[in-house]
């Protein structure tokens, strides 16, 4: 996308689109209350999958709920010399990238473009993964009377 978030650039709209650190979660971490997104997404911790509207590609939960591990290894200057489209991370490394933010993420970091990282052994209640199943595209119907 060309905007900060799939729904646009306004962090105040996050509560309608993603489960991030907002006014529902802030009471559990009073020290971080000033960082909370305005509004209520209805969940202080994880939310049921698919609770929020899909993005323009029809994919749910690309922001918030849990950080998602991605296959890239992290490198501080990883994108400095990479192509703009489909950049590839380093072939090896010490820490893996996670993206999208979680229920405990401030709006600044709840973006698909923001890269966070941890060692592959890291286990948190706010980190997960996305399972993907490839499916065949639907067959177009044959015109009446067409032979197989």
Predicted features, each with a name:
Residues 1-116, 120-125, 132, 147:
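Functional-site microenvironments in short loops/helix caps that host divalent-cation chemistry
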Residues 14, 140-141:
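Short catalytic/ligand-binding loop motif for oxyanion handling, primarily in non-cytosolic enzymes
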Residues 105, 138-139:
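Short, acidic Gly/Pro/Ser/Thr-rich loop/turn segments
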């Amino acid at each position: 996308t060309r905007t900060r978030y799939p729904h646009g650039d306004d962090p105040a709209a996050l509560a309608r689109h993603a489960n991030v650190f907002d006014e529902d979660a802030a009471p559990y971490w009073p020290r971080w209350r000033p960082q909370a997104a305005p509004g209520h997404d209805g969940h202080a911790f994880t939310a049921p999958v698919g609770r929020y509207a899909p993005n323009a590609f029809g994919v749910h939960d690309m922001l918030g709920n849990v950080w998602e591990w991605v296959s890239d290894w992290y490198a501080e200057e990883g994108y400095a010399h990479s192509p703009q489209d489909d950049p590839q991370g380093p072939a090896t490394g010490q820490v893996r990238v996670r993206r999208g933010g979680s229920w405990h993420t401030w709006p600044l970091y709840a973006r698909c473009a923001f890269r966070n990282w941890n060692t592959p052994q890291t286990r948190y209640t706010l980190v997960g993964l996305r399972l993907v199943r490839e499916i065949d595209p639907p067959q177009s119907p044959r015109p009446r009377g067409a032979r197989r």
